[in-house]
Amino acid sequence: LIRSPEQAEAQLQEGTQDFVCLGRPQIADPNWANKALTGEGTIKRCICCLNCIESMQNNAYIGSHGECSVNPLVGHENMPLPKNGDGRTVVVIGAGPAGLCAAELLADRGFDVSLYEKKERVGGQINLAAAPPDKAKTDWFTQDAAAACLEKGVKIFTGKELSISEIKEIKPYVIILATGSAPVKPRFGGNYNPEDVYTFEDILTGRISLEGKNI
């Protein structure tokens, strides 16, 4: 899989291949070739999650299109994208995948976008998804989405939790609430200690260690 223009060019120069053909990278970023040619803009990398393959297999039975975890516009390329922001202020609260994608899309439409994240790092639960072994490429989504937002003028504030009074002072045209979800601990039958039920966040953040335990 070709990861970058630099990799493609290096393999051409080495004689490893005579030409380069892109599959999934072009789905993740349809402007891959143009960005490689001009050197402008962040190329959004395929994170090798195979959602494209799985979704095309599943959706074929219902006559629908494939999907891409990196590019939410796959299958919606003809959807109108009105440039009607006119510099109006939009506040996006939460810089997980939804918040990052919303901020970039709104900036494309001409809005003045400010993105707020109460944690010190953007990415939301993607940061947890990238934590297990061999899942580091998942973090490419966060890196590339944040870079694209900054390129398009989105102002990103981390470690900042907005109060209602602060929002009123900003007087935004629209507020996008993208604060994510909270994990639920299901109830089980039989005898068990509820305190022994942990969420994926407990484990992946290292708050709870299960080494040497029966799971």
Residue ranges with predicted function:
Residues 1-93, 97, 101-108, 112-113, ...:
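Flavin-dependent oxidoreductase catalytic cores
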Residues 92-158:
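Beta1-alpha1 glycine-rich phosphate/pyrophosphate-binding loop at the start
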Residues 172-174, 178-185:
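Glycine-/small-residue-rich beta->alpha transition segments that form the dinucleotide
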